[in-house]
A protein has these predicted regions:
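Iron-associated oxidoreductase/ferritin-like identity signal
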Residues: 1-154
Length: 154
């Protein structure tokens, strides 16, 4: 089924965000575990896998719409040097993804591509949950202090 070029461009933009997130979260998960923060590492690993599932769905949709998934295009991976900085890097990536997803939802709706719109909406829901978790962690750092928060991540 031939898809609309605007929707396919949005799908590739969202794919770019997801591919970047897979790599960033995977590396952060390994860093967290290496630093001894197993809980944080486990969570970050699960997020990386979640992003991979999103990428899988996006690639399938692009192919269904007779487009070409651009799996070579990624943003610069932002890697923190300590746990709080890692979370701030993840938050910046998620905030960019939210903007792109909201634009994609609006355009898919205008172009009557309701399946792509629903895919974007489902991914948006997942990314908003991740933002909430990151913001909760950062708020805890402010409330209980970095050292106490880190101790809770062992």
């Amino acid at each position: 089924m031939k898809g609309n070029e605007t929707v396919i461009k949005h799908l590739n933009q969202v794919l770019k965000n997801e591919l970047t997130a897979i790599n960033q979260y995977f590396l952060h998960s390994k860093m967290f575990k290496d630093w001894g923060y197993a809980k944080l590492g486990d969570y970050e690993y699960k997020e990386s896998i979640d992003e991979m599932k999103h990428a899988d769905q996006i690639i399938a949709r692009i192919l269904f719409l007779e487009g070409l998934p651009n799996v070579q295009d990624m943003h610069k991976v932002m890697i923190g040097e300590e746990p709080v900085e890692c979370l701030k890097c993840d938050l910046a990536l998620e905030e960019k993804a939210l903007v792109d997803l909201k634009k994609a939802i609006v355009d898919a709706d205008k172009l009557n591509d309701f399946v792509s719109r629903e895919l974007f909406r489902a991914i948006l829901d997942s990314e908003e949950e991740h933002v909430d978790v990151i913001e909760t962690h950062l708020n805890l750092v402010d409330k209980v202090g970095k050292e106490n928060w880190l101790q809770s991540q062992i």
